[in-house]
């Protein structure tokens, strides 16, 4: 019997809107299956409520912004205590000292994203790879697995595509003539 893919999204207050980016990215994966996306209740969650939502998740996406805020710290600690599979993601252009220390103490390296498009690509690729479980836990058909392969290759190509930022003289530059000028000071 096919299992439901259960995902928990924890986020600091400044990245609350990115939860929706993750939901949309997952909805666009080209296969039909049962996926449950969970989060902490928005108003004064208890430890028990957080524990209940994280306890049997297949993946925890943790989004760290410029500062670590409640209840994100408890979500993080609970996910590790329950030995959940955590993917630490950060968008911290100006991290506070507390956020810097929080990042430093992570048992895994952080994946950086700078905008919603990058976050969606990272999560889509990760979920697609989770769905390709060797035991086919999620009951995908051969045609769906093939679609996932094509989807993963496309996302990998996007990841490897060079930035469109100007480089060299495209972004402005200075040309220096290094040829000797023998007749400059002749009278």
Feature-to-residue mapping (PLM):
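C-terminal interaction surface of TIR/SEFIR-family domains
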Residues: 96-187
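Conserved N-terminal substructure of TIR/SEFIR domains
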Residues: 1-59, 146-187
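Cross-kingdom TIR/SEFIR domain
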Residues: 23-32, 36, 46-133
